[in-house]
Amino acid sequence: TGFYRTPGLSWDPANGKGSPFYYFACGAAVSEVEVCAYTGMHRLLRVDILHDVGDSLIESIDRGQIEGGFVQGMGWLTCEELRWSDAGKLLTDAPSTYKIPTVGEVPEAFRVALHRQRKLPGAQVIFGSKAVGEPPLMLALSVREALRAAVAAFAEGTAVALAAPATPEAIFSAIAALRAAPGEANAVP
């Protein structure tokens, strides 16, 4: 067997300088949500994503990877809850108890734009392409933050503590806490 070491990586922790990554894949996302104050249920209405793909090899595949990574992250932050018994047994260990996002959670308005950068300064990547499968997972933070902003709208000017994943129960609890103590700031996780 062999190994691969990405060339040119370095990091000096004493100085906080170096090149710890070969390149960066940047992106931005904006999410619009709707929250029911009585149940904590929410709907993702719209997502707009811009993701840096370098020089896209196959645009349709890149878009699918970006959408898939985003939806996976959305599940992690909104419904994929791990629950444990007092004895340490995982209680959410089956499809009936561990919820993942379905097509019903994906918004109809799901827009993905590709930012293309033909030449990557200093990087010798395959045909100029960049990673598009894993980085979009973090773009789903826009969903959780949109949910937090929606909950905060119930008590304007108040910071909101919202658990992750932001399940309907967590959203309902956050709204109930705002109603119980109006005007008091909650710690933001």
Pin down the residues of each PLM region.
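C-terminal catalytic domains of large/alpha subunits in multi-subunit enzymes
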Residues: 1-189
